[in-house]
Regions:
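Glycine-rich, acidic loop regions that bind phosphate or pyrophosphate groups
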Residues: 100-143, 237-339
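Active-site diphosphate/adenylate-binding microenvironment
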Residues: 8-19, 26-29, 34-41, 341-419, ...
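Thiamine diphosphate
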Residues: 32-116, 266-269, 274-278, 304-306, 312-314, 318-322, 386-464, ...
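Phosphate/pyrophosphate-binding active-site segments
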Residues: 2-3, 139, 175-177, 200, ...
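Conformationally flexible catalytic loops at phosphate/diphosphate-handling active centers
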Residues: 119, 147, 151-204
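Glycine-rich, anion-gripping cofactor-binding loops and their flanking helix/strand elements
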Residues: 64, 214-294, 394-426, 440-441, ...
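Glycine-rich phosphate/diphosphate-binding loops that line cofactor/substrate pockets in enzymes
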Residues: 10-20, 61-66, 151-156, 194-209, ...
C-alpha cells in the first residue's frame, strides 16, 4: 500500500519541485497544515509578513525575478486583505501562486458563521486573479496545484489563487499522487510569413520607433541589435532598462516630455512590443503615435485595445524581435544628424525634470553614485518616485527600477523586501513616502526580522504630497484631508533595531547615502522634506481630470 501523506505535505513537496525559494504569508489556523509541512521539511524559507497585503506584494516582487512567487493567506478577511496586491500582480503580469484557506468542506457556502467564513470568497478571488480554483477533493489537490502554477507562468502571466478547505489541507492522500511538474506552455512562435511582412514594413521606414513594455522584458539582446541598427527606442516605466538608458537610440521613458514628443512625431513607423500604452504614459491616449502602427502581444484580446493598430501580431515578443534582429545588417536607419537630435531631446527632457526636482535631483545623483551597478531601485507611488525615481534615475538593465503598475500606494516597502530576498547578493533601495508607508508600516518589522538587504528611503513631507499638487491644480488651491500625523521614522526604525539616519539638508545627501548603501543589511534613511523644500507634482500629464 502506498505511503500516505497530508495534502499540506503534498503541497510543500510540489512547491519544492518548482524550486520555490520562499513563501510569504501570515500564519493562521486556516493554513497551519501547509505551514507545518513546510516547516518540518525545512527546504523552503517562510517569510512572516505582518499583513496579507504585504505578503502578496513581497511574493509579487519575488516572482518578477524568479519566475514564480508564492504567497499564503488565511480565509475570509485574510484573503480579502490580499486583493489589492493581487490586482497589482495582475497589472504587472507577475507569475504568482496565492494559496488561501476555506472553511471545512461540509460548511462551504452555507453561511453558518464558521470562523473566517466569507460569502463567495472564490468570486472576489476570480475578480482579482488571472484564475482562481477551489480544491474540493483531496485527491485532486496536487493536480490542481500543478495546473494553477502552469496558468500563472503561461503568458500573459498573472496571479492564480487556490482556496483549500482546512479539512482538505489535513486530509491524507497516497504519496503516489505526487507527479512531476507540468512544463510551461511553449512560447507562441511567429509564422515566417508574418516575420517577412513585418520586416518589409520595418525596412521600408525611414525612422521607426520601437515602444517597449513589460511583455518585452526578456528581449534585451534583440532590442539592442535593432537599436544599434538605428531603430529609436522608448519604453514604458515597466520596460525601463530593456535597452540601457545610456544607449544612443534610447529615449528612456520620457514619453511625456515636449522635446521627446516632438522627436517621436518625426518617426514614420511605430512597433509596439508588449505594452498596453497606458494612460499615464500617453497623456490619456492623446499622444500621437506615428503610423503605420504594428503591435506584438501574446494576448489576442490586446489588439487595438488603446490605439488603433494597422496590424497585431499574436506572438512572443522575444521570439519575434529576435527574428527581426537576425535580419539586421549594420546600421539601417537614422544617421549622425538623427542621433544628435535624439540626444538633444533626451537632454532637454532630463534637464526639465531636474529643474522640476530642484534639490532632490542631488538625492537622485547621490544614490546613483553610491548604489552598486547591479543595485535595484524599488519605488512606491509617491511624488519622488513618480518624478526623479521614475525617469531621472538611470536603468542599466531590466527590472532595475520597479514599482506598482496599478498605481496603488503602500506597496514600496514590501516590494523592496521581496526584491531583496529574491536577490540576496544585490543592494536594494526602497523609495517610499510617509503617506504610502503608513499603509504597510508593519512590514518594517519584517524588514528587520528577515535582515533584507534594503535601504528604505522615506521621503517625509507630512502627508499626501501628490494630493496637494492635484488640489492646487484642479481645486483652486483648496487643501483638504492631505495632512497626516506620522511618527519620527528615524526613532521608529531604531526601535526596530535598524540603523537609521535623518537628513534635513540637501548638502548631506551624498554623505548619508554613501554610508547607508555601503552597509549590508537593512537600514532606513528619513528625508525631512519640510526643511529641504516641497516637490510639486499633480500627476502625469493627461487630459483634464475634473
Amino acid at each position: 500500500m502506498s505511503e500516505m501523506i497530508t495534502v499540506g505535505d503534498a503541497i510543500a513537496r510540489t512547491l519544492e519541485q518548482y524550486h520555490v525559494e520562499a513563501i510569504y504569508g501570515v500564519i493562521s489556523i486556516h493554513n497551519l497544515p501547509i505551514a507545518d509541512a513546510v516547516g518540518q521539511r525545512e527546504k523552503i524559507r517562510f517569510v512572516p509578513a505582518r499583513g496579507e497585503a504585504g505578503s502578496v506584494t513581497m511574493a509579487d516582487a519575488h516572482g518578477r525575478f524568479s519566475g514564480l512567487g508564492v504567497a499564503r493567506t488565511s480565509t475570509g478577511a485574510g484573503a480579502g486583505n490580499a486583493v489589492g496586491a493581487l490586482v497589482e500582480a495582475m497589472n504587472a503580469g507577475t507569475p504568482l501562486l496565492h494559496l488561501t484557506g476555506q472553511v471545512e468542506k461540509a460548511w462551504l457556502d452555507a453561511d453558518t458563521g464558521f470562523i473566517h467564513e466569507t460569502r463567495d470568497q472564490l468570486t472576489f478571488l476570480k475578480a482579482s486573479s488571472k484564475r482562481a480554483y477551489r480544491i474540493s477533493n483531496a485527491n485532486q489537490a496536487v493536480a490542481i496545484l500543478h495546473k494553477a502554477i502552469q496558468e500563472a507562468q503561461t503568458p500573459p502571466c498573472g496571479p492564480v489563487s487556490v482556496e483549500i478547505p482546512i479539512d482538505i489541507q489535513s486530509a491524507k492522500i497516497p504519496l503516489s499522487l505526487l507527479t512531476a511538474p507540468l512544463k510551461r506552455a511553449p512560447a507562441v512562435e511567429p509564422e515566417a510569413s508574418l516575420v517577412d511582412a513585418l520586416w518589409a514594413q520595418l525596412k521600408q521606414a525611414k525612422q521607426p520607433l520601437l515602444w517597449l513594455g513589460g511583455g518585452a522584458l526578456e528581449s534585451g539582446e534583440a532590442v539592442k541589435t535593432l537599436a544599434d541598427a538605428g531603430v529609436t527606442v522608448i519604453s514604458s516605466t515597466h520596460g525601463r532598462g530593456i535597452l540601457a538608458d545610456s544607449h544612443r537610440a534610447s529615449l528612456r521613458a520620457f514619453h511625456n516630455s515636449p522635446s521627446v514628443e516632438a522627436l517621436i512625431s518625426q518617426c514614420d513607423f511605430t512597433l509596439v512590443a508588449g505594452s498596453r500604452l497606458r494612460s499615464n504614459e500617453t497623456r490619456s491616449w492623446t499622444l500621437e503615435l506615428p503610423t503605420p502602427r504594428v503591435q506584438i502581444d501574446i494576448d489576442p484580446a490586446a489588439a487595438s485595445r488603446n490605439y488603433l493598430m494597422d496590424n497585431t501580431l499574436v506572438a512572443d515578443c522575444r521570439a519575434l524581435l529576435a527574428a527581426l534582429a537576425e535580419r539586421v545588417q549594420g546600421r539601417m536607419w537614422g544617421d549622425a544628424r538623427w542621433d544628435s537630435q535624439l540626444k538633444a531631446a533626451v537632454e532637454a527632457a532630463e534637464q526639465g525634470l531636474r529643474d522640476q526636482c530642484g534639490a532632490y535631483a542631488k538625492l537622485n545623483d547621490a544614490i546613483a553614485q553610491a548604489l552598486p551597478d547591479d543595485g535595484i531601485l524599488v519605488r512606491d507611488i509617491t511624488v519622488s518616485g513618480s518624478l526623479w525615481g521614475s525617469r531621472l534615475f538611470r536603468a542599466h538593465g531590466p527590472l532595475m527600477n520597479i514599482h506598482s503598475l496599478a498605481g496603488a500606494i503602500g506597496m514600496g516597502l514590501p516590494m523592496a523586501v521581496g526584491t531583496a530576498i529574491a536577490n540576496p547578493q544585490r543592494k536594494v533601495v526602497g523609495l517610499v513616502g510617509d503617506g504610502g508607508l503608513s499603509l504597510n508600516l508593519g512590514e518594517l518589522a519584517t524588514l528587520a526580522q528577515e535582515k533584507a538587504n534594503v535601504t528604505l528611503l522615506i521621503m517625509n513631507d507630512g502627508g499626501y504630497g501628490v494630493m496637494r499638487g492635484i488640489q492646487d491644480k484642479y481645486f483652486g488651491g483648496r487643501q483638504y484631508y492631505n495632512e497626516l500625523h506620522t511618527p519620527d521614522f528615524t526613532l521608529l526604525a531604531q526601535a526596530m533595531g535598524l540603523q537609521a539616519w535623518s537628513v534635513d539638508r540637501a548638502e548631506d545627501f551624498q554623505a548619508v547615502m554613501t554610508e547607508a548603501l555601503a552597509m549590508p543589511g537593512p537600514s532606513v534613511v528619513e528625508v525631512k522634506m519640510g526643511q529641504i523644500g516641497a516637490l510639486r507634482f499633480a500627476g502625469p500629464p493627461q487630459k483634464t481630470l475634473y
